[in-house]
Regions:
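Flavin-dependent oxidoreductase catalytic core characteristic
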Residues: 1-164
Length: 164
């Protein structure tokens, strides 16, 4: 949410954008939940039950401008990677493994959601958001790739190396 606001914040009054609500809720959630780990625990159920993937697929059905279509195509591939590692983690049926990769999974979901919001805004107001959409999608794609590779290559047997 903070990354999304940084991009939108430069264009003026942020109450006009969907990410304003996400930013506001993220700040409140931090106060009430206490720690990022508790937020991870709360969010991971929606990652593993397919809610975030379904939301991302719904966002894909929202038309975007011709200029934003190449970004949308890249974003669809990012969602494919998110779904692939989410499904692989669920299929492993290892709670410790899920706990270990949970934050990476929800970070993948988060950057995909924020990318969709930017593409939607860039479609409506390209003069304000087109460049930001390109910049943020480059960042988000790198983050998804990083987490995708880590989760895909990680073996449950390696968990021992991460314990105290």
């Amino acid at each position: 949410a903070y990354d999304c606001i940084q991009i939108h914040g430069g264009s003026g009054f942020m109450l006009e954008y969907a990410c304003q609500r996400i930013y506001r809720d993220a700040r409140i959630t931090s106060i009430y939940e206490g720690t990022t780990q508790l937020q991870t625990v709360a969010a991971i159920r929606y990652v593993t039950n397919g809610s975030y993937a379904a939301t991302l697929r719904d966002y894909e059905t929202i038309p975007c401008s011709e200029e934003m279509q190449p970004l949308m195509d890249r974003l669809k591939e990012m969602t494919n990677k998110f779904e692939a590692v989410t499904n692989a983690t669920k299929e492993a049926a290892n709670q410790e493994l899920l706990d270990f990769v949970a934050r990476r999974l929800y970070e993948m979901a988060a950057v995909c959601v924020m990318s969709h919001l930017l593409i939607q805004d860039a479609t409506k107001a390209p003069e304000l958001f087109a460049k930001s959409a390109v910049v943020y999608l480059n960042y988000a794609e790198a983050e998804v790739e990083k987490h995708f590779n880590f989760i895909r290559k990680f073996k449950a047997e390696e968990l021992e190396s991460y314990r105290k």
